[in-house]
Regions:
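Hydrophobic/aromatic-lined pockets within catalytic cores
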Residues: 9, 63, 128-131
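Short beta-edge/loop segments at beta->alpha junctions of small alpha/beta modules
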Residues: 1-50, 147-171, 175
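Exposed, interaction-prone assembly regions rather than primary DNA-binding/catalytic cores
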Residues: 50-102
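Hydrophobic alpha-helical interaction segments
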Residues: 101-177
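Residue-level detector of family-conserved "landmark" positions at structurally sensitive sites
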Residues: 14-15, 69, 137
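A conserved hydrophobic position in a structured secondary element of the catalytic/binding core
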Residues: 13, 53-54, 118
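N-proximal short alpha-helices
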Residues: 24-27, 31, 89-97, 112
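A generic structural signal for short, non-catalytic loop/turn and secondary-structure boundary residues
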Residues: 10-11, 67-69, 85-88, 109, ...
């Protein structure tokens, strides 16, 4: 592995976690986006169908938070300690959740597809725990942007199923501001 890393064929994300550098980027200072890196690490630990990019990280992938963040959040079936990345000042936080019970969609990244919470699920997650992911200043604006393009019936159904009516009301308040 060390030899492949030295030759620029592998990129080291964190201790024990590497990704293959895309062929057209070999030899450059390429590194994947934080959300992509987090999905890759979580997939290596739990398998690709058992993890979901969520919270502020999902909002970033949905285009609702434009600035880069230093924390990525991933829903996983069992708790795991946070992993500090070695290629940048960032951390991947794992949130134990029933990943099969979350509303998700496939999202294509530079390293392949991953599961990401839908805009509706992301709204509920952000409104429920706005401080998760260390970007609480961005959350109301992100929720408002996602709310504008969300399916309101689906949002109401998810809030009811997941007992997140209070979170939905908070999101609606942010969307009206």
């Amino acid at each position: 592995m060390a030899r492949l890393h030295e030759r620029g064929l592998l990129h080291r994300l964190a201790d024990g976690y590497y990704v293959v550098v895309p062929q057209d980027m070999t030899g450059s200072s390429w590194m994947p986006g934080l959300e992509t890196a987090a999905a890759g690490i979580a997939s290596a630990i739990y398998g690709p169908d058992n993890i979901l990019v969520m919270g502020v990280s999902a909002a970033r992938l949905h285009g609702a938070i434009p600035r880069a963040l230093a924390t990525a959040t991933v829903a996983v079936p069992a708790q795991h300690r946070p992993i500090a990345l070695s290629d940048r000042a960032a951390v991947v936080r794992f949130v134990k959740r029933n990943t099969q019970g979350l509303d998700a969609e496939r999202y294509d990244t530079e390293l392949g597809s991953t599961l990401v919470t839908t805009p509706e699920q992301t709204i509920l997650d952000l409104a429920h725990r706005p401080d998760l992911g260390d970007a609480e200043v961005d959350v109301p604006t992100a929720v408002a942007a996602l709310y504008e393009r969300s399916d309101k019936d689906r949002l109401q159904a998810l809030a009811t199923e997941q007992r997140r009516i209070a979170s939905l009301r908070r999101a609606e308040t942010w969307a009206r501001q």
